[in-house]
């Protein structure tokens, strides 16, 4: 076990190096872009090295532990550590943030502040996934709000201020319940705050209090995931945000809610989770159907993709609620799979919108003729999103299906009903995605704009798309590569904390 503070370096490096952006010489945006890209690549290489040489996959315990006193008055510690549940999310964060930085290449207005905010988000996300202290977890959760709000309000569409305000109100409202839960758990049974996750795992609570804690945390996660009916900020936000910001929102930010649900609610509040799990499964099934049906009625293709994200989050909720090894591993696989696919669909939608200056499907048609590369990649990732066999979306949804079917928690008839509802959702998914492709790319040329405006994808964009397409295919063909990260930790979590 290495005593070197790898995780502290990974958390602090992006925001510290990002603050130096403002001291770079004023010689255009090129220096700022390459500096930011270098920081992202260095961070990603460091985390890859640390995990390859200092992390044992077969060990289900917390590794790379760090514990230092931070604020002595409150007995507040800087506690970090990772296990199989957080490893995949951290690697996804490093990979997607690096590519989102590459996607943000065209941003020229206030580019120093833009790239600094992206790096600040990077630090917050790595900090959240590696946090082993409840208050530190909350601080990292909140650290996301300011960068995202500024990225939305300064580099968005016409209704960017409305979307940014809606986002901050929803997430800040959920955070109030989160903070109450953190303080309640930390101060329960003691005058001194006890916020170490290792100690809180063994803490027992009265049934009513545990349910209240669980529900408070669930509201905060329901906003970020999102879970209906707290999802309405998402379509507005994705409809207005710059596509590089959308990549971080869809690829990482939504997954923070799912990670919190597993790390806090499942691990620390097992009895309440056992009671709530049937409701999670029911809500997840309803969400798949509702969001897929709503997506079909969207005229704005960015909002259609946003509702498809809400629908796919339903599979994660069902996997978490199934309380099985297979189901929870399927949920983690879906977190990574949708992180790749959802982020790329928003990138493609954003680049297409920048070229066409049109977002309404009835105004489009025949776009495949001037932009064949965008058409090819849009079609490929749409196939991945609708769970085409051989791609990561298919494997993730199939594993969640098996997790629900094999769950001893549910009787046969409820299982059959929920499986039937999920199947209907899987039928609706190709309907809204293929109809979007047909309206955008096929048919006659409905818009009246000169061809010069419609340049196809350049080398930078194609490189980015291929970088994401390779893991989507790789996970679809050999999912054990990802499942091996979490399978031992999931087994330990479920065997230790759940009634048989």
UniProtKB/Swiss-Prot annotation:
Looking up InterPro entries in the UniProt record yields: NADH_Q_OxRdtase_chain4, NADH_Q_OxRdtase_chainM/4, NADH_UbQ_OxRdtase, ND/Mrp_TM
User: Where does it reside?
Assistant: Plastid, Chloroplast thylakoid membrane
Keyword vocabulary terms for this entry: Chloroplast, Membrane, NAD, NADP, Plastid, Plastoquinone, Quinone, Thylakoid, Translocase, Transmembrane, Transmembrane helix
Record's catalysed reaction(s): a plastoquinone + NADH + (n+1) H(+)(in) = a plastoquinol + NAD(+) + n H(+)(out); a plastoquinone + NADPH + (n+1) H(+)(in) = a plastoquinol + NADP(+) + n H(+)(out)
- Its predominant location is plastid
Q: Which residues cross the membrane?
A: 4-24, 37-57, 87-107, 113-130, 134-154, 167-187, 211-231, 242-262, 272-292, 313-333, 334-354, 386-406, 417-437, 462-482
Broad class of enzyme this protein falls into: translocase
Per the similarity annotation, which family is this?
Belongs to the complex I subunit 4 family.
Q: Which PANTHER family match?
A: NAD(P)H-QUINONE OXIDOREDUCTASE CHAIN 4, CHLOROPLASTIC, NADH-UBIQUINONE OXIDOREDUCTASE CHAIN 4
Q: Mind telling me what this protein is named?
A: NAD(P)H-quinone oxidoreductase chain 4, chloroplastic
State the organism of origin: Oryza sativa subsp. japonica (Rice)
Q: What is the lineage of its organism?
A: Eukaryota, Viridiplantae, Streptophyta, Embryophyta, Tracheophyta
